[in-house]
Amino acid sequence: MILGRAVAVCLVWVAAFGAGGARPEMQTISIPGIPMELVFRALQPGEVLLAEMKDSPSVRRISVRLGGRKYEIDRSTGTRPGVFIGLDLGLKSGPLVLDVVGEKTDGSVEHYSEELAVAPREYSKRYIRVDETMLAPPPAEKERVKREQDLLQAVLGVKTPDWLGTGSFIPPLAQEAFQNFGQNRIYNKRVSSVHAGVDIAAPYGTPVRASNSGNVVLASDFYLNGKIVVIDHGRGVFSLYFHCSKLLVKRGDRVRKGAFIARVGNTGRSTGPHLHWGIRIFDSRVDPFSLVALPLE
């Protein structure tokens, strides 16, 4: 049993980082005068930044403002206080102002500001042929599609302040993912959409693993997304799993990293057995492998 789990973890590691198994090199920005570091793979649209408070008893709270959103890091949030910041896939390249305020236990305040340079990111384009009912649903299904979209947004809008994850994130399948995050998809040569996740092709029925520990906040069957699972990992981080053939969890379940939550399928707007795996951080659509790259152990 232990050997089987070790092999599975090894395969997932290879899927994430290749046969070499090396985690990509991280970049770090240390904030002068404030015990905080910003860790990230790249400063590009679709990337994830980790803002961590370092060990310093004299600072009780840090406020971070980036891209129009304010984040609070409080020492009371756990043994590893920090926040995840997502750079949405639609973010324009160019300057992005980082403002950091450190509140000390004696009441004094330290302030730091820096202009970060967001590099451009190129996305691919793909033409896809699907059944017309997946582009223009029958009248009886249009209300269902809207209701499901509203439900998904409502679920993603509820943020859990505590961190529920266990160490670093892992891919949900051992198979290698397509490099199609942010892809501009044109269906039947007339309807376009942006692909806000990555696709992983795998045999029908292959077990899908939870990419980290958390609470199942949605497990349902959607018209376009097929059978889906959404896991809340806390602190605004959600993982999404679409087009499954079978769900192995239900809403309200607490799952551990690596647990089987579903099976690969071809449900919804899909052209073959695969898993759509997405990550949302607050309102930002980010590359799942940017989150996997972060060293959270």
Predicted regions and their residues:
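Cationic-aromatic interfacial patches
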Residues: 23-115, 120
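Surface-exposed, glycine-biased beta-strand/turn segments
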Residues: 112-225
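Short, well-structured beta-strand-loop connectors
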Residues: 207-217, 249-264
